Design a protein with these regions (language model features):
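Bacterial N-terminal signal peptides
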Residues: 9-19
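Intrinsic low-complexity/disordered segments
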Residues: 3, 20-22
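Bacterial N-terminal signal peptides that target proteins for export
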Residues: 1-10
Length: 302
């Protein structure tokens, strides 16, 4: 007899790739004009020089304050201009790199604002990849194999008319990302960053809402959807099971709440491509997503 349950699947986003198994994905969005596969578009950001100076000041490296500016996207499809976008640095250790990564928000200063269906744009400098190809190759491979992965393209970045170099334009993983791929888009999704090691912190879900000492603005387990409910019980259940289940019961208890097969498939690909910033090595960033699935006695179908 089949019944609806809730289980955590893995959507990882880090230095190289993102994905989980194809059975969980119900829709595959087209690349569209925001993620051109066969040309390099230009992104031009313009903001007050004093605001840019604040963003680039090393003392403000970990600030997530957004500053107003103008976004211009130039490609063979035409030129789009969006005023009153939010601009800030993004990333973790990359914030201290010479080549910064940036986030552009279309809905910070304009409620409901979007560009080509996107609320955010991630412009990654990929400072540790001289080829500027690793991330795109792996993400495109993941998409071709049916894994859930963000759309991606290369762009030229200009800030206040100064050329900043070739950048990777990576689709932002948020509620919009989920809605484009799942019928059930109401699940909870957490952005987990270092030191999120899935350690058992007890029965109180509030214990998992802590922030690291170096960044009081962002929780280590940051709920990215359903923020008003702020329900951390699923993260608590996962950490509690990982930390306390006996050897005899571990497999059964974990599979009841977590897509083990999908995680192992993804981990195999991450090891193959040398992705170091993941849970099996150095947990830099990962995204567990709680989503409904159907389960029977003889099969599990996401």
């Amino acid at each position: 007899m089949k019944h609806l349950c809730q289980r955590l699947i893995w959507v990882t986003v880090g230095v190289l790739l993102a994905g989980t198994i194809t059975q969980a994905q119900e829709y595959v969005p087209e690349l569209g004009p925001a993620f051109l596969a066969d040309e390099v578009a230009s992104v031009r950001l313009t903001l007050a020089q004093t605001d840019l100076d604040f963003i680039l000041n090393p003392d403000n490296a970990y600030s997530n304050e957004e500053w107003p500016g103008t976004f211009v996207y130039e490609s063979s499809t035409g030129t789009d201009t969006v005023s009153s976008v939010g601009i800030r640095l993004r990333g973790n250790t990359s914030r201290n790199a010479a080549k910064k990564s940036f986030k552009v928000s279309f809905n910070t200063f304009i409620s409901g604002g979007k560009w080509n269906g996107l609320e955010k744009m991630n412009l990654n400098g990929n400072h540790n990849d001289p080829s500027m190809m690793r991330a795109r190759m792996v993400w495109e491979y993941m998409r071709a194999q049916g894994y859930i992965a963000p759309r991606i393209s290369h762009v030229r970045l200009y800030i206040n008319d100064e050329y900043k170099g070739l950048y990777i334009n990576v689709e932002h993983v948020d509620e919009e990302f989920i809605q484009k791929r799942f019928k059930h888009d109401h699940g909870n999704m957490w952005k987990c960053t270092y030191p999120a090691d899935l350690a058992d912190l007890g029965d109180n879900p509030e214990a998992y809402k802590f922030t690291p000492p170096w960044n009081s603005e962002q929780r280590t387990y940051e709920l990215k959807t359903n923020n008003t409910q702020d329900d951390y019980s699923a993260i608590r259940d996962l950490c509690h099971t990982v930390g306390t289940a006996s050897d005899a019961d571990f497999q059964c208890e974990l599979e009841a709440i977590f897509d083990v097969d999908g995680f192992l498939r993804l981990a195999a690909v991450e090891i193959l491509v040398g992705h170091w910033g993941q849970l099996h090595r150095e947990p830099e960033q990962f995204l567990p997503l709680r989503t409904p699935f159907r389960r029977s006695l003889d099969d599990v179908q996401l």
